[in-house]
């Protein structure tokens, strides 16, 4: 997806900056080498992932640099904030803004979008971003009153505009009701976000050596130590389970 975004931005900015043909060719080849069939499923030896981790990090850094150059070339000078949508269709998006003192964004129609600040940076929920395009917003740094669309009746019951969420005593999703489609998402008796661990003792090799009976011995991770709603704001609700 990063490479597709880079290619799109490079085409859009080609009237201002030259298309980075050599760089994109090198990046594609590096990425495709690391799509080898033993690497993708996690079945290569440990040393392979030490190498690919460094190579992916270097590629991501280069892609980010090229993308930033092209987005900057497409933006008009000014104090606004420009948001790009590289998807092939218009839509609503939750956009990360990083660390910022911006409290809200204002579009050209006068619609105000509140910004929520979290431990992982600021986020804003934007409506109808244009397909493969961008939109510039004015920024507001003064405090904005914005009610949250999320309601907690207690620590284990959350209401959102789209869902009813219920957690059990282990922190598992006991119920997820889809309000728009009027349906229960889980089958009766099933839970969401259940982590199940299986015993893995290879007989001969470190990889590709999975016992046919491995499913007969497993452990469910249900020893909940802490359940805390860390964030409830205009954009998101953040739940932390330990």
Where are these regions (language model features)?
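Basic, alpha-helical interaction scaffolds
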Residues: 1-18
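Catalytic and substrate-binding regions of extracellular carbohydrate-active enzymes
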Residues: 21-25, 33-242
